[in-house]
Amino acid sequence: MIDTKTAIEKITNGEFDNLFTDIYIDSSMIDYQKKRYVHAIEQYETIYCPDKVAIFSAPGRSEVCGNHTDHQHGMVLATSINLDTIAVSAKNNNDVVRFVSDGYDMITLDINDLEVNNDEAGTTVSLIRGVLRGLKDHGYKIGGFNAYATSDVLVGAGLSSSAAFEVVVGTIISGLYNDMKINSVEIAQISQYAENVFFKKPCGLMDQMACSVGGMVNIDFKDPTKPIVKKVPTEFEKYDYSLCIVDTKGDHVDLTDDYAMIPSEMKKVANFLGEDYLRDCDSNEFYIHLDEIREAVGDRPVLRAIHFFNEEHNVKNAVSSLENGKFVEFLDAIRKSGNSSFKLSLIHISEPTRH
């Protein structure tokens, strides 16, 4: 914990510059981040009062390979990015969470009321309530806190703004009440629970895991209760490459129902083959019975199942290529993944926008 005035002084005079470089990598971002953090602390002081606070960060994520495989217990390759949600926070002396996100009204939540409220589906308060409930059910201590948060993770742009928010809430509770002892995998699982059960979006676990664990990670969800997480070495600069985030001005905020159709249709194929998830299906059996499956469930579910089976190979190839320094082969796996994802995407293809 650090006094807000002291934090501002130390940030301003450069005492945390090395820490900012560790977090954001790009040295050209440091001045911006220093101003951003100072502004967040000042907003906290204005809304609440000068206090001893902790400052938490949770990054957005980019899927690298393994599109729509996580909800079928498949494999993914994902990375955190240097756009993040930060929260200035401190305990308060009651059982109330007071949470202000930049540009929004204060959310007030009684931590003794952590039941699912269907009227809150799709709202920020549902995510906070769900994370708190999940942490409590896992035996962790929870309590009231004040927080001010600001985010550079674009909403509805495929960078997992909701996952970053869930993870930062979980990390606040870990830091303020549990000595930062809640591991990143468990925070991710609890965050997914909040989004599935309270927010009512049937997402897989990739988003939360990438945001919580950080870095480039290969995640195997064959047993989603015990996902296998492996850090993957990346030296993009060695090949004069960078991962760039482009704001296309499109969004998927209103596509939850369309999104939900993807796991639903994939499961139809899995069910035909006697399983609950495609990961447990034999791809050879799938192709042997292809005509029967098409007749039973339709063409789009079949195409999405083909995508899943191919995508599992793409992930393996991408990871192996990075581990063995075969960058051209890595790019080839990414292109194959993107091509398949594009062809089997939602009906509503984003139109180019002019600004």
Regions found by a protein language model. Give the residues of each.
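C-terminal nucleotide
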Residues: M1-R61, I86, A90, N94-A121, ...
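Glycine/serine-rich anion-binding loops at beta->alpha junctions
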Residues: A58-H73, D152-V169
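Structural signature of FAD isoalloxazine-binding scaffolds in flavoprotein oxidoreductases
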Residues: M75-N94, V213
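DPxDG-like acidic metal-binding loop motif
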Residues: S80-N82, L159-D179
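Glycine- and acidic-rich phosphate- and metal-coordinating loops
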Residues: L132-L154
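Phosphate-handling active-site elements
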Residues: D137-F145, I173-I187
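Alpha/beta catalytic cores of group-transfer enzymes, especially the acyltransferase/condensing modules
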Residues: D179-P227, V232, I334-S337, S341
